């Protein structure tokens, strides 16, 4: 497999000109609240959402209080694909995106007439930071014969350079379709997800060498030891994880697919290799089942994330209330970039809608499950 670059950095400038590295992100995580403070803030936010004609769109990885608040107020808690669809289709005047910056940008691109706010504009993503648009554009220019496919975890400027945008829940299907049509691909930025898809589809993929700070820290050796400690447990793995971790999985899939697996599989215990923020929704969806965090560090080692994204952790009730009260932290995307970026996003959404119709028409649910099932050494 060819490589685009040898390494990436997590402390690079954002496309928008701001910067917030790992250390800065952890320093900006709001302090925990006392129960009475939390209840008061939730009541205040509910009133502000009504006043501002706003809806809360939250990712599975943010704080459990934010997820619960989104559910309680008619908002959305979902993966990035469903967040994009929900924000586009909802009639709210204001979308409040609890997640990371690329999610807010995508919401604005799909809903240019709506106001899009975020609790903290510095909440970014290591994959975004590791794929600066100027370097990526130069790489694409060097391979003009290839179709450019970028993961959702990229800036609007990088999406504007792409032919397709994908999420982990539909990326395999889209790449398989492109491969069937004989297209060669540039893939960015996550090398682990790209490698997983390449192995599943056999597609000719030239990889950008980015990685997710959280998933890159999961360890295959330690996971194998944990599996032997809990032999009855099923292992659920997000495909942004390293190959050695994916190889041990019973189910490999997006956040939504992992939650579905926790509900549908008859196991009572699961080892989960993704951001621990997902455990809130898993416990709600599968009450009575036990969820164990996969290890993120080896013997005597430390972890940068400890299975939780520092930028996701920057989202909290306190800064959400402040944003709604003051109307700041609004997302803007330059018109020319937004216009170009919308094309690959719309292509993905249209493909996903057609794929869903095909699956429903055929009733071929086993095929969908097989696409994200681990087969031996993945």
Swiss-Prot record:
<dbReference type="InterPro" id="IPR036094">
    <property type="entry name" value="NadA_sf"/>
</dbReference>
<keyword id="KW-0662">Pyridine nucleotide biosynthesis</keyword>
<feature type="binding site">
    <location>
        <position position="125"/>
    </location>
    <ligand>
        <name>[4Fe-4S] cluster</name>
    </ligand>
</feature>
<feature type="binding site">
    <location>
        <position position="168"/>
    </location>
    <ligand>
        <name>iminosuccinate</name>
    </ligand>
</feature>
<dbReference type="Pfam" id="PF02445">
    <property type="entry name" value="NadA"/>
</dbReference>
<feature type="binding site">
    <location>
        <position position="59"/>
    </location>
    <ligand>
        <name>iminosuccinate</name>
    </ligand>
</feature>
<feature type="binding site">
    <location>
        <begin position="151"/>
        <end position="153"/>
    </location>
    <ligand>
        <name>iminosuccinate</name>
    </ligand>
</feature>
<keyword id="KW-0963">Cytoplasm</keyword>
<dbReference type="GO" id="GO:0051539">
    <property type="term" value="F:4 iron, 4 sulfur cluster binding"/>
</dbReference>
<comment type="similarity">
    <text>Belongs to the quinolinate synthase family. Type 1 subfamily.</text>
</comment>
<feature type="binding site">
    <location>
        <position position="309"/>
    </location>
    <ligand>
        <name>[4Fe-4S] cluster</name>
    </ligand>
</feature>
<dbReference type="InterPro" id="IPR023513">
    <property type="entry name" value="Quinolinate_synth_A_type1"/>
</dbReference>
<feature type="binding site">
    <location>
        <begin position="238"/>
        <end position="240"/>
    </location>
    <ligand>
        <name>iminosuccinate</name>
    </ligand>
</feature>
<dbReference type="GO" id="GO:0046872">
    <property type="term" value="F:metal ion binding"/>
</dbReference>
<feature type="binding site">
    <location>
        <position position="80"/>
    </location>
    <ligand>
        <name>iminosuccinate</name>
    </ligand>
</feature>
<keyword id="KW-0004">4Fe-4S</keyword>
<dbReference type="InterPro" id="IPR003473">
    <property type="entry name" value="NadA"/>
</dbReference>
<feature type="binding site">
    <location>
        <position position="255"/>
    </location>
    <ligand>
        <name>iminosuccinate</name>
    </ligand>
</feature>
<keyword id="KW-0808">Transferase</keyword>
<feature type="binding site">
    <location>
        <position position="212"/>
    </location>
    <ligand>
        <name>[4Fe-4S] cluster</name>
    </ligand>
</feature>
<keyword id="KW-0408">Iron</keyword>
<keyword id="KW-0479">Metal-binding</keyword>
<comment type="pathway">
    <text>Cofactor biosynthesis; NAD(+) biosynthesis; quinolinate from iminoaspartate: step 1/1.</text>
</comment>
<protein>
    <recommendedName>
        <fullName>Quinolinate synthase</fullName>
        <ecNumber>2.5.1.72</ecNumber>
    </recommendedName>
</protein>
<dbReference type="GO" id="GO:0008987">
    <property type="term" value="F:quinolinate synthetase A activity"/>
</dbReference>
<keyword id="KW-0411">Iron-sulfur</keyword>
<comment type="function">
    <text>Catalyzes the condensation of iminoaspartate with dihydroxyacetone phosphate to form quinolinate.</text>
</comment>
<dbReference type="GO" id="GO:0005829">
    <property type="term" value="C:cytosol"/>
</dbReference>
<dbReference type="GO" id="GO:0034628">
    <property type="term" value="P:'de novo' NAD biosynthetic process from L-aspartate"/>
</dbReference>
């Amino acid at each position: 497999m060819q490589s685009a670059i040898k390494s990436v950095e997590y402390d690079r400038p954002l496309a928008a000109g701001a910067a917030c590295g790992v250390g800065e992100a952890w320093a900006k995580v709001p302090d925990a609240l006392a129960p009475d403070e939390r209840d008061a803030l939730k009541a205040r936010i509910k009133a502000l959402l009504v006043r501002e004609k706003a809806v809360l769109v939250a990712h599975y990885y943010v704080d459990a209080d934010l997820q619960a608040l989104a559910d309680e107020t008619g908002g959305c808690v979902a993966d990035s694909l469903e967040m994009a669809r929900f924000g586009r289709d909802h009639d709210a005047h204001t979308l409040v995106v609890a997640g990371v910056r690329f999610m807010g940008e995508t919401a604005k691109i799909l809903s240019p007439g709506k106001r899009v706010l975020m609790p903290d504009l510095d909440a970014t993503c290591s994959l975004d930071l590791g794929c600066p648009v100027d370097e990526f554009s130069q790489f694409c220019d060097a391979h003009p014969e290839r179709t450019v496919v970028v993961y959702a975890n990229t800036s609007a400027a990088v999406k504007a350079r792409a032919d397709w945008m994908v999420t982990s829940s539909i990326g395999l299907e889209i790449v398989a379709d492109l491969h069937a049509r004989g297209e060669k691909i540039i893939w960015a930025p996550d090398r682990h997800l790209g490698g997983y898809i390449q192995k599943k589809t056999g597609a000719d993929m030239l990889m950008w060498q980015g990685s997710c700070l959280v998933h890159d820290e999961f360890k295959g050796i330690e996971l194998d030891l944990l599996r032997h400690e809990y032999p009855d447990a099923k292992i659920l793995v997000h495909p942004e994880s390293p190959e050695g971790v994916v190889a041990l999985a019973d189910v490999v899939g997006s956040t939504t697919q992992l939650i579905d697996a926790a509900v549908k599989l008859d196991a009572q215990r699961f080892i989960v290799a993704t951001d621990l923020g997902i455990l809130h929704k898993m416990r709600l969806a599968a009450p009575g089942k036990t969820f164990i965090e996969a290890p993120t560090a080896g013997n005597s080692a430390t972890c940068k994330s400890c299975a939780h994204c520092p930028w996701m952790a920057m989202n909290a009730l306190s800064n959400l209330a402040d944003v709604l009260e003051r109307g700041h932290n609004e997302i803007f995307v330059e018109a020319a970039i937004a216009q170009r970026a919308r094309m690959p996003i719309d292509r993905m959404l249209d493909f996903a809608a057609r794929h869903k119709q095909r699956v429903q028409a055929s009733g071929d649910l086993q095929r969908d499950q097989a696409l994200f099932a681990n087969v031996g050494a993945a």
